[in-house]
């Protein structure tokens, strides 16, 4: 069909997770609870770290920023998703779609670099303990975080420009619950080949550069742990990394599954649930992952609520 016969798309319509009205109510209640736990957990973690001087260390500075970016990208998606569960017409304007997309991409890609910075911090703490205060000074930590947010900003601009400079002049129905790359590319009436290559390359660079930093950091950490003679010392060293490894595995595993594939292999209905996992569930789990076995966080929480730590 001649593309000139199509009208230019000025708004999109989400299909959402389900079209069943009863399931929509159930999902609204479930995801509202999940999002509330997410907000309470991440805001609570930020407040705890800011207010307790015992947590004013590089490790918790990075954890505070992780909670911030988790809160950022989940809040770019969840409120709109919850509202759509209660409405029949899930319409979003072209500009609002671009804005949602931009904030989501910016925070997610910033998180990649925050996780890499956390891995580097663990490497220095375990492998270079005598030089820790110099290598992880306040200035270094600040530069690492500013660099993470700058990388997120650059990625935001690049992704948004590449995706929304395409022509959308056919169907405006997004088979998803938010504005994401694969369903948007599927709707474009432009030739998306070059954009797909550039987007894939950008995603690949961000993923693999940060994974490489994490992998190298943990390779040195593993060597250092093996050299520790006492079993107690090995366990203590490994316990400081266990939470971060869990968070990294969950986050990167899902993101790589979602984005580092050609669009021909996408099943949009199936991928919606993978998107739910990393946009809503992982941000909720991170405060739990990083605090459940952390004595410092538990002690700070007890102090905050006025209970003396044991």
Curated annotation (Swiss-Prot):
Regulation: Copper binding enhances receptor activity in response to odorant binding.
GO cellular component: membrane; plasma membrane
Topology feature Cytoplasmic, residues: 47-54, 121-133, 218-237, 293-310
GO terms of molecular function: copper ion binding; G protein-coupled receptor activity; odorant binding; olfactory receptor activity
Intrachain S-S bonds: 97-189
Keywords, alphabetical: Cell membrane, Copper, Disulfide bond, G-protein coupled receptor, Glycoprotein, Membrane, Metal-binding, Olfaction, Receptor, Sensory transduction, Transducer, Transmembrane, Transmembrane helix
Matches recorded under Pfam families: 7tm_4
Flavoprotein keyword on record: no
Compartments, as annotated in UniProt: Cell membrane
GO biological process, one term: sensory perception of smell
Transmembrane segments: 26-46, 55-75, 100-120, 134-154, 197-217, 238-258, 272-292
Binding locations of Cu cation: 203, 256, 261
Topological domain spans for side Extracellular: 1-25, 76-99, 155-196, 259-271
Glycosylation sites: 5
Membrane topology: Multi-pass membrane protein
CDD domains registered for this protein in UniProt: 7tmA_OR5AR1-like
Family listed: Belongs to the G-protein coupled receptor 1 family.
Biological role: Olfactory receptor that is activated by the binding of organosulfur odorants with thioether groups such as (methylthio)methanethiol (MTMT). The activity of this receptor is mediated by G proteins which activate adenylyl cyclase.
The protein, known as: Olfactory receptor 5AR1
